[in-house]
Amino acid sequence: MNEMKRLLSFVRRAVDDYNMIEEGDRIAVGISGGKDSLTLLAALAEMRRFYPKKYEIVAITIDMGFDGVDWSEVAEFCRRLKVEYRVVKTDIAKIIFDVRKEPNPCSLCAKMRRGSLHAEAQAASCNKVALGHHYDDAVETFMMNLFFEGRLGCFSPKSYLSNRKLTLIRPLLYATEKDVQYFVRRRPMPVMVSPCPEDHATERENMTNLLAELEKNNKGVKHRIFNAMCRGEIDGFKLTGKYPDAGKIEE
């Protein structure tokens, strides 16, 4: 199975299981320049060719205002995919690091970026926003909520923002980190290095490392956590009987 067919097997299943895409949708795809969002864009662009429900996609980047960031290669990538591309210039980095000097900036940054993305999606006449969170992200988010907030919770596979009249979808839900890496190794894309000084210095990075250690000593633990989320119907997750094989890659 080639890399695109493999990826689409996960994406199509998630989209169908949660009815993420409907006839006539105009979907904004949030593009950070990282491998996850670019992989999602490539998958949704390819799936337009054969998915029975016709839809349009618009790629949207929220430029945080860091110096020296060039989106021209991403723009060319979108042109090749025949996808409209919008870059929204903001001062988020300046506000967080220079004005407010936030000691723990990640939460505020995410909130501001989400607000800008949702506003631009509305401006582009989109009714849905697709985000690049995948299988491992779901497990990590669930565990972070358990460890640091003492609650059972995660982002939802599909959710509706009534104040924005936007539906958020996560089509990479069944694709693992290894699946995304497998795709990127075989399908060159303009993956960018994050200019954020807090990159890799977060609680999420710590949780990623903890889960990797648990997986090493307890094979399949992430798969079982994901399964438990579905059995418990945590935040809209549901049991369908078909999940990824814990990131198993056939080289």
Locate the predicted segments by residue.
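Alpha-helical structural motif
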Residues: 3, 7, 70, 176, ...
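Short, basic, helix/turn surface patches
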Residues: 110-122, 158-164, 211, 215-230
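The feature marks non-catalytic terminal segments
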Residues: 189-251
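Catalytic subdomain that performs nucleotidyl-dependent activation
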Residues: 57, 128, 136-216
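ATP-dependent adenylation/nucleotidyltransferase module used to activate substrates
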Residues: 1-140, 148, 178-186
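Residue-level detector of flexible, active-site-proximal loop/helix-junction positions
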Residues: 64-66, 92-94, 159-162, 175, ...
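Charged/polar, solvent-exposed surface patches and flexible loops
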Residues: 9, 13, 17, 76, ...
